[in-house]
UniProtKB/Swiss-Prot annotation:
It comes from the Bacteria. Signal peptide: none annotated. The chain crosses the membrane at residues 13-33, 34-54, 90-110, 121-141, 145-165, 205-225, 241-261, 306-326, 327-347, 351-371, 455-475, 481-501. This is Na(+)/H(+) antiporter NhaB. It is a multi-pass membrane protein.
Length: 530
């Protein structure tokens, strides 16, 4: 049946997305300029933020790059922000973009080693609770030294590998190397239930690992990008940063691990799914088959990948170069020494991360609108106006937490630390209060932001990855599964800010572990970020 040209244009717009979704996006594009010019630019700015969050929430209906990108282009066109401000945001976050382009591709070339290690862990640890704790703890430990995005890229790579192994067998194509694991049409009805259980099992492990990256990432100055900016502004080095965060990070870490155990034991919020026996059998058979067929060429590849993994951890922990550049070195070393020299073989490695890199650039355009329209200014001003120092600490933590749930935590942390630094320089607050506020800002941006995928770049990457539709991980499901962690991490962090931070910091001073900062040390700290 032929289709008219007009209908063809409508059908092509956002492709297979539902009609109601297309109408919603078109409505946003009509409403935004009207609100901006005839109502209030501030209101239009917040409207854009809400609409962008909507596109993220609907990521399984339509990848957010297209609808979010259209909204961002229009925002720039009508003057909500400028191309220069967007470019400034991209330049300020170039390390994150380099990381996505090169590090995620680098991890792709280490897939054999990762599958080898994690298959042993998955088969070796029979208890789901112990396995969940292992994933959460390992992700936390790695995120204290590596970037959370790198850790999540590793976990996603492993999960896709596990999923593909089972799906290939369940579809009756055990030996096929060209099997499409995104298509369920060949899956036997008897195995479909196992497949659903397996998806639930992988979902829970991924969220545990994702929260683990937040638990570990808050502890050190290299754990998250905003930590580096905060440490820089405060003039703290690696060791001092860890000690200053301890009054909050130690109880939060313990309670986070206890939450991991509790949700698995109670089976709430989508947790508790066990590895189906049929799936375990397939993975064990796969592991035995791999072991039997492994040649010296395969062993040589594993050894090379192991050595590259050591270089990766050492290079990142010691900050020998920008994260993305270390990722590029991983690509070069891994391909050179494992014989991957064809361009088309290398192209696959970049498929996963480049759409997300483009999405992140759009995200920074929205951040540029937040800056130019001063959307957060009323909240920041209200918190800084509070006289009581204890209440100010708690309010900073809460305000950071709430804003980090709707915006990028790197941006929120940067804006707040710059405002507090300005207050210190103007003599509004003391150096001691500045140090305590810096701790509140760091923990506030890192802990409550696990509530939604927009707060943590690692969560957003997971939501928009090729894995999410395979294991049916939607925005709403992520928020629901993160809920127990959000409540525990946010409340324990708040408790630590109110009751532990000041007395324990004073105790650390008395013990001589850290020294009180001076205004001079903050003045000499090199300004970073915005």
């Amino acid at each position: 049946m032929s289709i008219s040209l007009g209908n063809a244009f409508i059908k092509n717009f956002l492709g297979k997305a539902p009609d109601w979704y297309k109408i919603a996006i078109l409505s946003f594009l009509v409403i935004n300029p009207l609100v901006f010019f005839f109502v209030d630019p501030f209101t239009a700015g917040w409207l854009l933020v809400v609409e962008f969050i909507f596109t993220l929430a609907m990521a399984l209906k339509c990848y957010p790059l297209q609808p979010g990108g259209l909204l961002a282009i229009e925002a720039i066109a009508i003057g909500m922000t400028s191309p220069e401000q967007v470019k400034h945001e991209l330049v300020a976050n170039i390390e994150v973009l380099l990381l996505l382009v090169f590090m995620v591709a680098g991890i792709y070339f280490m897939k054999q080693l990762l599958l080898f290690i994690f298959t042993k862990i998955l088969i070796g640890i029979k208890s789901k609770t112990a396995l969940s704790v292992a994933f959460c703890f390992t992700a936390a430990f790695l995120s204290a030294f590596l970037d959370a995005l790198t850790v999540i890229a590793v976990v996603i790579s492993v999960a896709v590998g596990f999923y593909a192994i089972y799906h290939r067998v369940a579809s009756g194509q055990g030996g096929s190397q060209t099997h499409d694991h995104t298509c369920d049409s060949d899956v036997d009805e008897l195995t479909r239930e196992d497949l659903e259980d397996y998806r639930a099992f992988l979902r829970s492990l991924l969220i545990h690992a994702g929260v683990g990256t937040a638990l570990g990432g808050v502890m050190t100055m290299v754990g998250e990008p905003q930590n580096l900016i905060i440490a820089d502004q405060a003039g703290w080095m690696f060791g001092e940063f860890i000690i200053r965060m301890l009054p909050i990070t130690a109880p939060v870490f313990i309670c986070g691990i206890l939450t991991c155990i509790a949700v698995e034991k109670l089976g709430i919020c989508g947790y508790g799914a066990k590895l189906p026996e049929n799936v375990r059998k397939i993975l064990e058979d796969y592991e035995a088959e791999e072991r039997k067929n492994r040649t010296n060429i395969d062993n040589a590849k594993l050894i090379i990948q192991g050595l590259i993994a050591v270089w990766l951890i050492v290079g990142l922990a010691l900050h020998l170069a920008a994260v993305g550049l270390i990722g590029l070195s991983v690509i070069i070393l891994a391909t050179a020494f494992t014989g991957v020299i064809e361009e088309h073989s290398m192209g696959k490695a970049f498929e996963e991360a480049l759409p997300f890199t483009a999405l992140l650039a759009v995200f920074f355009a929205v951040v540029a609108v937040i800056i130019d329209q001063e959307l957060f200014k009323p909240i920041i001003d209200a918190v800084l106006a509070v006289e009581d120092k204890g209440a100010q600490l708690a309010l900073f933590y809460v305000a950071n937490g709430v804003l980090s749930m709707v915006s990028d935590n790197v941006f929120v942390g940067t804006v707040y630390i710059n405002e507090v630094k300005a207050a210190l320089m103007d003599g509004v607050i003391t150096r001691d209060q500045f140090d305590l506020l810096a701790v509140a800002i760091n923990t506030g941006t890192n802990l409550p932001s696990v509530a939604t995928p927009n707060g943590q770049a690692a969560f957003l990457f997971l939501l928009t990855s090729a894995l999410a539709p395979l294991i049916q991980l939607s925005y709403g499901r992520m928020v629901w599964m993160a809920l127990p962690y959000t409540i525990v991490l946010a409340l324990v962090g708040m408790f630590g800010i109110i009751f532990f931070l000041e007395p324990m910091t004073a105790m650390f001073y008395d013990l001589g572990w850290i020294a009180p900062g001076t205004i001079e040390s903050a003045t000499s700290a090199i300004s970073s970020g915005h």
